[in-house]
Each structure stands twice: as C-alpha cells, then as structure tokens.
C-alpha cells in the first residue's frame, strides 16, 4: 500500500469514528452523507448533522482531490511547485453546538503531495485543532490544552509549545485584534520523516476526540436563555469573518475549484452582526475578552470554573 493510501485510509476511518461519537452524544439527529466528484479530479464525502439535541450543526468532510496547477493560495508559499501535478486528502470539521456554553470547535488533518514528470517533488502533512468558546470555563480550556500537550510529548519537548504558538498566531482576526478562540495546535509543511509525521497526524486526529467530547458532555445541559443565545449568534459572526477572510483551507478550496457547499460547511447555520456592540462591563460576555489572546494556559496559577 502506498504512503498516500495509508493516510487516506486513516482519514476515512477517523471521519467514521468522529461521526459515531457525535451521533451517540447527540442522541437525536443523524449525519446525512453526500458523495461528490470534482470535475478536475478526485472527490469526497461530506457529512452534515443539523438540528440535533446537542449540535445545531456538525459538518465533517473527507476529500481526496488532485489537479495539474496549484491555486494561488498554495503556490505563493511554494513557488517552486508552480506547474506541478498535485494530490491532497484531508478531513476537516467544524461543530456548532446548540448550547452557548458548549464551545465551537474545528479540526483539520491533511496530506499533500506534488509530482513533476512522474516523480514526487514534495509531500507534507498539515492540520491541527482549535476551540472557540463563548462562555469559557478555565477547567475546559486547561483540559483542552492538557490533551494537546500530552499528545505532543512523544514528538519532542518543544512540539507542544511550537504548535500552540503557531495556532495562536494563525487563528487571529487581525482587523479585530483578537484570536478566534483559546487556541490549540496548528502545523503545516511537516515533511522531515514520513513515519514520524504520519504518527503525529494520527495523534492529533485521535487526540481531538479526547480533547473535545468530554467538554461537550460536561456543558451541553447547562441552562441558558435569550441573552446567551443572542451573544452566541453575535460571536459566530467572528467565526464567519475569519473563515472567509483568512483561512488557508477555505481559500485553497475555492481557488482550486473545490465544491463550495463542502468548503463552506464550516459556516454556522445562524449568525448575527450588531453595529457598535459592547458587552456590559463586568458581565459574563465581557469576560470573554480575557480569553481572546495568547495565554500560557497550563502554567497559569488561576484555575477556576
């Protein structure tokens, strides 16, 4: 079996595992699966769960696509690959829970290969996961980062710090001067050792289940009202802004002729913007600002709910 097929098999199995956990936790709705083909080459399967008891929308897609010309979002970073044939596979998800006390989350794990004249000229792994709470709990954030740190440990003492920092620097709404959430892990261009890098990708994918779903289970029955719902919809607007303005995966997908319905599945089903909104000082909504900047979560002394 080729290296590419090994990665592909892992990713399709990961999609299945995550979907099974989501359906079990939700207990009400099920994923609808949409198989699609891309005219330029390749295809995928997009799965969407909507209007569940726990998840307002949960979208998770697998894609295996190929082409003969890299889109600008990729070739600008790798000009030496202009004109090369390429193939990429990945799993990407964004979950928008119903309860405002359950954070939105994102995971992406991917593998990219480029060839010229029948010979591989580049191949690398990328991905990561991040968490976007609206009403954050320190306990949840510390759990999230503890799982991230522990899965990084077998890959070197600096891996967690480096990929946490990369996440903090990547998921930033520069026009708002705030991070998208409380971070996690982000990596790209991982190409030193296939077996080691593939093992890390698997650790990230597997670790996501351990990092996210205990938080969902802990918070999805928390009582909330119209005020919390309105704030959740307002903050979802920031998620839309980041994905459409800055996200590399979104730009790559759209510029490469990808399937728009699958690419934009990351966007929430309901969202609102409000001109000049400022939360009341001292409110739970105002408290969120303290979390939307890089912090050393695992070494801070203040740990509370």
Swiss-Prot record:
<keyword id="KW-0560">Oxidoreductase</keyword>
<feature type="binding site">
    <location>
        <position position="96"/>
    </location>
    <ligand>
        <name>a divalent metal cation</name>
    </ligand>
</feature>
<protein>
    <recommendedName>
        <fullName>Oxygen-dependent coproporphyrinogen-III oxidase</fullName>
        <ecNumber>1.3.3.3</ecNumber>
    </recommendedName>
</protein>
<comment type="subunit">
    <text>Homodimer.</text>
</comment>
<keyword id="KW-0350">Heme biosynthesis</keyword>
<dbReference type="GO" id="GO:0046872">
    <property type="term" value="F:metal ion binding"/>
</dbReference>
<feature type="region of interest" description="Important for dimerization">
    <location>
        <begin position="239"/>
        <end position="274"/>
    </location>
</feature>
<dbReference type="GO" id="GO:0006782">
    <property type="term" value="P:protoporphyrinogen IX biosynthetic process"/>
</dbReference>
<comment type="function">
    <text>Involved in the heme biosynthesis. Catalyzes the aerobic oxidative decarboxylation of propionate groups of rings A and B of coproporphyrinogen-III to yield the vinyl groups in protoporphyrinogen-IX.</text>
</comment>
<comment type="similarity">
    <text>Belongs to the aerobic coproporphyrinogen-III oxidase family.</text>
</comment>
<feature type="binding site">
    <location>
        <position position="92"/>
    </location>
    <ligand>
        <name>substrate</name>
    </ligand>
</feature>
<feature type="binding site">
    <location>
        <position position="106"/>
    </location>
    <ligand>
        <name>a divalent metal cation</name>
    </ligand>
</feature>
<feature type="site" description="Important for dimerization">
    <location>
        <position position="175"/>
    </location>
</feature>
<comment type="pathway">
    <text>Porphyrin-containing compound metabolism; protoporphyrin-IX biosynthesis; protoporphyrinogen-IX from coproporphyrinogen-III (O2 route): step 1/1.</text>
</comment>
<feature type="active site" description="Proton donor">
    <location>
        <position position="106"/>
    </location>
</feature>
<feature type="binding site">
    <location>
        <begin position="257"/>
        <end position="259"/>
    </location>
    <ligand>
        <name>substrate</name>
    </ligand>
</feature>
<dbReference type="Pfam" id="PF01218">
    <property type="entry name" value="Coprogen_oxidas"/>
</dbReference>
<dbReference type="InterPro" id="IPR001260">
    <property type="entry name" value="Coprogen_oxidase_aer"/>
</dbReference>
<dbReference type="GO" id="GO:0005737">
    <property type="term" value="C:cytoplasm"/>
</dbReference>
<keyword id="KW-0963">Cytoplasm</keyword>
<feature type="binding site">
    <location>
        <position position="175"/>
    </location>
    <ligand>
        <name>a divalent metal cation</name>
    </ligand>
</feature>
<keyword id="KW-0627">Porphyrin biosynthesis</keyword>
<dbReference type="InterPro" id="IPR036406">
    <property type="entry name" value="Coprogen_oxidase_aer_sf"/>
</dbReference>
<dbReference type="GO" id="GO:0004109">
    <property type="term" value="F:coproporphyrinogen oxidase activity"/>
</dbReference>
<feature type="binding site">
    <location>
        <position position="145"/>
    </location>
    <ligand>
        <name>a divalent metal cation</name>
    </ligand>
</feature>
<keyword id="KW-0479">Metal-binding</keyword>
<feature type="binding site">
    <location>
        <begin position="108"/>
        <end position="110"/>
    </location>
    <ligand>
        <name>substrate</name>
    </ligand>
</feature>
<dbReference type="GO" id="GO:0042803">
    <property type="term" value="F:protein homodimerization activity"/>
</dbReference>
<dbReference type="InterPro" id="IPR018375">
    <property type="entry name" value="Coprogen_oxidase_CS"/>
</dbReference>
């Amino acid at each position: 079996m080729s290296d590419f097929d090994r990665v592909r098999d892992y990713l399709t199995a990961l999609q299945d595992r995550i979907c099974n956990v989501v359906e079990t936790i939700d207990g009400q709705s099920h994923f609808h699966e949409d198989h699609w083909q891309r005219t330029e080459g390749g295809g995928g399967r997009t799965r969407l769960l909507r209007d569940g008891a726990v998840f307002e929308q949960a979208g998770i897609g697998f894609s295996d696509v190929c082409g003969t010309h890299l889109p600008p979002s990729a070739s600008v970073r790798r000009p030496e690959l202009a004109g090369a044939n390429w193939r990429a596979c990945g799993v990407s998800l964004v979950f928008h829970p119903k309860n405002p006390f359950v954070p939105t989350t994102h995971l992406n794990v991917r593998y990219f290969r480029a060839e010229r004249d029948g010979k591989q000229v580049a191949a690398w792994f990328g991905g990561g996961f991040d968490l976007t709470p609206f009403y954050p709990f320190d306990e949840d954030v510390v759990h999230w980062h503890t799982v991230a740190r522990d899965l990084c440990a077998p890959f070197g003492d600096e891996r967690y710090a480096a990929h946490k920092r990369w996440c903090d620097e990547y998921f930033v709404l520069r026009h708002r001067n705030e991070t998208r959430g409380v971070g996690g892990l982000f990596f790209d261009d991982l190409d030193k050792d296939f077996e080691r890098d593939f093992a890390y990708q698997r650790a990230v994918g597997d670790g996501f289940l351990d990092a996210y779903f205990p938080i969902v289970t802990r918070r999805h029955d928390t009582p909330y009202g119209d005020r919390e719902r309105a704030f959740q919809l307002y903050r979802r607007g920031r998620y839309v802004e980041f994905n459409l303005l800055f996200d590399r995966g979104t730009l790559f997908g759209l510029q490469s002729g990808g399937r728009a319905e699958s690419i934009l599945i990351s966007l929430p089903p309901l969202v609102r913007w409000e001109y000049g909104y400022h939360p009341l000082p001292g409110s739970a909504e105002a408290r969120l600002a303290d979390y939307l900047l890089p912090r050393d979560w695992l070494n801070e002394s203040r740990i509370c709910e």
